[in-house]
Amino acid sequence: YKFNNQREPLMFLDAIYGDKNIYSTPRDMMKWDYALSKDQLFAEKTLEEAFKGYSHERRGTRNYGLGWRLVEMPSGKKIIYHNGWWHGNNTVFSRLPADSTAIIVLGNKFNRSIYQAKKIAGIFKGYGIQSDDDE
């Protein structure tokens, strides 16, 4: 459904799998994060290359790796993430590998406020994202 409770119509891109139409649960996303952090799916060297910035799309901390968006903090810490949306659903999947943490938020009705989940990283030291509670 759309934000105004209208049904999303089917369209030709609905049959593209891998780019869209991947449905999951928070538990499955947690397993995915665990597998990435324990080198169960890919070699450590492969992940190092995937999580390295190549595009330097914006001056400063924002970058794009191989299929992953990156925020590279001056502290040396990284937020590795990829958000998603399609036809009324949207997701936030962020990894804070230095703190063995994943932020996973899945929504079944498109709502831009879901992307505010990035502020959770501000709980951890060295990410430079300030929450209202920071001193």
Locations of the language-model features?
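Catalytic loop of the DD-peptidase/beta-lactamase superfamily, centered on the K-T-G motif
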Residues: 4-135
